[in-house]
Structures are given as structure tokens and as C-alpha cells.
């Protein structure tokens, strides 16, 4: 077994709590399938027979009861009161990890050719290979913004070599001063570095087993994304001794990069002597000189996905965008499953767009129009209703003559007769009164708050 696959399904969705207060984030519907279905399906498509899923007991129950997979899931439940980062979760399951690992987030929806990332990892005998995508802003408004400016996300500064594969620099702008400081040892080998500020980490990582061994012994690292990967990138082109000397000068790194916990103490001699991977792909390795590869023991690579679907569902806006995109993806992944479920009852079928999904046991009345929308299971949509660019979860009722546009309607909500709703988020179990006009509002229970 070359890799062990690990799906991280622990995070509670802190930036979309109005959605996750009643449904655990891994089970949030996207295209009428739980979010966690997408990384599991990706692994199954490329031939994985086993997967480790790190999650909570609530998600475990759903996985055992509802999921039908060929893969054998090994479900690891973290303690209910634990506040674990991704690195903490890897440490928690460490006894199960015997080989290199492939780590995916439960909220990743992508049609990436997974071998593109894995081949990088194999070809360069990398310590880390990761997936990134070009950032893209949705042109659609986010429900409930009320005209406020979108919060500016902190950008990552990503430096790569001329091939765009070797990851040479990685830092968030919040951690940077007014200048970028690049190691002289990197500039000697790569005098030209391409910097990107428009790349987004997809949270898909191939990691060498010795990196996991290092992580097990270094409890100060809690996050793969924000701590472990920048550490590995910094460690490139450094020997253990030279790095030790540098640490003595850099007080702010001392606590995390103690000599006894240096990544180089976990490297196996075989990793530097085994040149077979380079023989297989030498023609593709123009960016790294042959004589440098063995000495550069820590090697980080990135596959930048420029086309296709690659989205992490971490905010309401990204959740909406994912639901707009998945009908096309599902048509390719599950051609045997119709976009309109066979048990759905639709009076005016010609008014349901081919870009919409309709879940099981849903009823749609006469002269009701559904365009660019995802409708969940057991919904009741009465006559003369117009729904455009929306997501309706399960068991939603929409009464006669209502018009809903650009909105998310959560489980068991009721939209009464003649209501007009635009760019809103309606929380679970909420009721909108008849003939109400709601624009750019977030209508949720008092225990549901969210960062958009």
C-alpha cells in the first residue's frame, strides 16, 4: 500500500454556523449529496479500497447508516470536547499510519485528476505535494450581505520555480512585514522565483511518513495548513546543522524548531540515496538540477489547478457557488443518476431547468418554475412559485405565488403564500409570513450566527 488516505471531517464550520448549527458541516448538502461524499468519491474513483475518516460521533452515525461505498471506511472519532486542528488529528490517529499519507478536507469538491498531485510526489521523491487552484470571485451576490463590502481575505504569497511546480516560498500576508525575506540558499539555486497572490490552498496534501513521524513528536504544531507546510517550505535547502545555527539567531522560531525536533532528524538515509524516482521522470525534472536533489532532502511541490472545478466550501458564498457548479459535476460522476429524482412529482416538468437538481419525494405544483437551483428531498412547492438561483434543503414548504431568488432556505423552513425573497438566508425551521418582502436578510434563530 503506497498511500493511506485520510479525510478530515472534524471542523464545525465556524464561518457558516447558521448552516452547521443543526447539520454537521460534513453532512451539509451540496447537490443533494453530503459534502463528505465528494472527497470519498474522488478516492474511490482512483481505486482506493480503504480510507480513514477523522470525525465526530454524529457524523459517524450518518456514515454508517446512509453511505454506500465500495471503500472500507475506518472511522476515528475524536473526543466530543476536543478542540483539534488538522495536525492534532493526525497525531490522534498516528498508530494507524504506516505509510505515506494523502490528506483531504471533507469540504473539498473537485474534479482534479488526482494522479497529477501524486505523480509530483512520486517523481521528485517529495516530502510534500499539495493542490492549489487559481482564486476566483463569484459574480453572484452572497445572501444576507445587505450591501456591505465583502470582507477582504488575507492573501497567501506563494513562490514557485520557473516550472511552477517547486514550492519555494509560502506565507500569509498577515505574517509578513513590509518586505519579503528570501533565503540566499534558495536564490542561489533559483535566481528567478515566480510569486502568486491569487492561489488558494485546496487542502489536499501528500505527506511522507517521516513528516508524520516528525509531527507526532512536535505537539506545538496544530495545523497542517498554517504551521506544518510553511515549516517544511522554510526547511528546504537547509542542512540540519545550518538550520540549527539559524534558529539560534531567530528567537521567534526557537520554540517550534528545537534541535531535537528538527525535521532532518526524522529523515531516513534511504530517502537521500534512492535515486530511482528521478530516473523515471528526469525529462520532467528540468527545474531541479540532478546534483542538487539528494542534498535538498526536504522537497515541497505544488500542482496548480487552472481549469476545472476545485472549491473548498468554507463560507456561505462558496457554499452557494458549489451548489451552482455541482450539477455539471454530478452528471459526469454519476451519469446513472438523473438530475430530477424518479420519485419527485412535478406537474409542469418543462418549467424545471436542465441546470437544476430535484431531490426524492419532492412535489412541485402547477406553473412553478425552477431555474439554476438545487431542491432537496421531501420539499413541497405549491402552484405558481418561481425559484431562481437558490438552494432549498430538505422538507422546505413554499406556498402559492411565492418568488425566491438567490437565496438559501434551510431544512423545515416555511415560506408562506405570496412571499418575495431575494438574496436571503432563511435558517432551519424559520417561517416567512405571507406576502412578506425580504431582501438581503439573514433570518435565523438566536443561536445561529455566521461570518459571511
UniProtKB/Swiss-Prot annotation:
The keyword ATP-binding does not apply. It is found in: Cytoplasm, Cytosol. Keywords: Acetylation, Cytoplasm, Initiation factor, Phosphoprotein, Protein biosynthesis. The modification N-acetylmethionine is found at residue 1. Activated by the chemical integrated stress response (ISR) inhibitor ISRIB which stimulates guanine nucleotide exchange factor activity for both phosphorylated and unphosphorylated eIF2. GO terms for cellular component: cytoplasm; cytosol; eukaryotic translation initiation factor 2B complex; guanyl-nucleotide exchange factor complex. Disulfide bonds: none annotated. It comes from the Eukaryota. One of its GO terms (biological process) is T cell receptor signaling pathway. GO terms for molecular function: guanyl-nucleotide exchange factor activity; translation initiation factor activity. The modification Phosphoserine is found at residue 260. InterPro entries: eIF2B_gamma, NTP_transferase_dom, Nucleotide-diphossugar_trans. Acts as a component of the translation initiation factor 2B (eIF2B) complex, which catalyzes the exchange of GDP for GTP on the eukaryotic initiation factor 2 (eIF2) complex gamma subunit. Its guanine nucleotide exchange factor activity is repressed when bound to eIF2 complex phosphorylated on the alpha subunit, thereby limiting the amount of methionyl-initiator methionine tRNA available to the ribosome and consequently global translation is repressed. Component of the translation initiation factor 2B (eIF2B) complex which is a heterodecamer of two sets of five different subunits: alpha, beta, gamma, delta and epsilon. Subunits alpha, beta and delta comprise a regulatory subcomplex and subunits epsilon and gamma comprise a catalytic subcomplex. Within the complex, the hexameric regulatory complex resides at the center, with the two heterodimeric catalytic subcomplexes bound on opposite sides. Belongs to the eIF-2B gamma/epsilon subunits family. This is Translation initiation factor eIF2B subunit gamma. The gene is EIF2B3.
Amino acid at each position: 500500500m503506497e498511500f493511506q488516505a485520510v479525510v478530515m471531517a472534524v471542523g464545525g464550520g465556524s464561518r457558516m454556523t447558521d448552516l452547521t448549527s443543526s447539520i454537521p458541516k460534513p453532512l451539509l448538502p451540496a447537490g443533494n449529496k453530503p459534502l463528505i461524499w465528494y472527497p470519498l468519491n474522488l478516492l474511490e474513483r482512483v481505486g482506493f479500497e480503504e480510507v480513514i475518516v477523522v470525525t465526530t460521533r454524529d457524523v459517524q452515525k450518518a456514515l454508517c447508516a446512509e453511505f454506500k461505498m465500495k471503500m472500507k471506511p475506518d472511522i476515528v472519532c475524536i473526543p466530543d470536547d476536543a478542540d483539534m486542528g488538522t495536525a492534532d488529528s493526525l497525531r490522534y490517529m498516528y498508530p494507524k499510519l504506516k505509510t505515506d499519507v494523502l490528506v483531504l478536507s471533507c469540504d473539498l469538491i473537485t474534479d482534479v485528476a488526482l494522479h497529477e498531485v501524486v505523480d509530483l510526489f512520486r517523481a521528485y521523491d517529495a516530502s510534500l505535494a499539495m493542490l492549489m487552484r487559481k482564486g476566483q470571485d463569484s459574480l453572484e451576490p452572497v445572501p444576507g450581505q445587505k450591501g456591505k463590502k465583502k470582507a477582504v481575505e488575507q492573501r497567501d504569497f506563494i513562490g514557485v520555480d520557473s516550472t511552477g511546480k517547486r514550492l519555494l516560498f509560502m506565507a500569509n500576508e498577515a505574517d509578513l512585514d513590509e518586505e519579503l525575506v528570501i533565503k540566499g540558499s534558495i536564490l542561489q539555486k533559483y535566481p528567478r522565483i515566480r510569486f502568486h497572490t491569487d492561489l488558494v490552498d485546496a487542502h489536499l496534501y501528500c505527506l511522507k511518513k517521516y513528516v508524520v513521524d516528525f509531527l507526532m513528536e512536535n505537539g506545538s504544531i496544530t495545523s497542517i495548513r498554517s504551521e506544518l507546510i510553511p515549516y517544511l517550505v522554510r526547511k528546504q535547502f537547509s542542512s540540519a546543522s545550518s538550520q540549527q545555527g539559524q534558529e539560534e539567531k531567530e528567537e521567534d522560531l526557537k520554540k517550534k524548531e528545537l534541535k531535537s525536533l528538527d525535521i532532518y532528524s526524522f529523515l531516513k538515509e534511504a530517502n537521500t540515496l534512492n535515486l530511482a524516482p528521478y530516473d523515471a521522470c528526469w525529462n520532467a525534472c528540468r527545474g531541479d538540477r540532478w546534483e542538487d536533489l539528494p542534498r535538498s532532502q526536504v522537497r515541497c511541490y505544488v500542482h496548480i489547478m487552472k481549469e476545472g472545478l476545485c472549491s473548498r466550501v468554507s463560507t456561505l458564498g462558496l457554499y452557494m457557488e458549489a451548489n451552482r457548479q455541482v450539477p455539471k459535476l454530478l452528471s459526469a460522476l454519476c451519469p446513472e443518476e438523473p438530475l430530477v429524482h424518479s420519485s419527485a412529482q412535478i406537474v409542469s416538468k418543462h418549467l424545471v431547468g436542465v441546470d437544476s437538481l430535484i431531490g426524492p419525494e419532492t412535489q412541485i405544483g402547477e406553473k412553478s418554475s425552477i431555474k439554476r437551483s438545487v431542491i432537496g428531498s421531501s420539499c413541497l412547492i405549491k402552484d405558481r412559485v418561481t425559484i431562481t438561483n437558490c438552494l432549498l434543503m430538505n422538507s422546505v414548504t413554499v406556498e402559492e405565488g411565492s418568488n425566491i431568488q438567490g437565496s438559501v432556505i434551510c431544512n423545515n423552513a416555511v415560506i408562506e403564500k405570496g412571499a418575495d425573497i431575494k438574496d436571503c438566508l432563511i435558517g432551519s425551521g424559520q417561517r416567512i409570513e405571507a406576502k412578506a418582502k425580504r431582501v438581503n436578510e439573514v433570518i435565523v434563530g438566536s443561536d445561529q450566527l455566521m461570518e459571511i
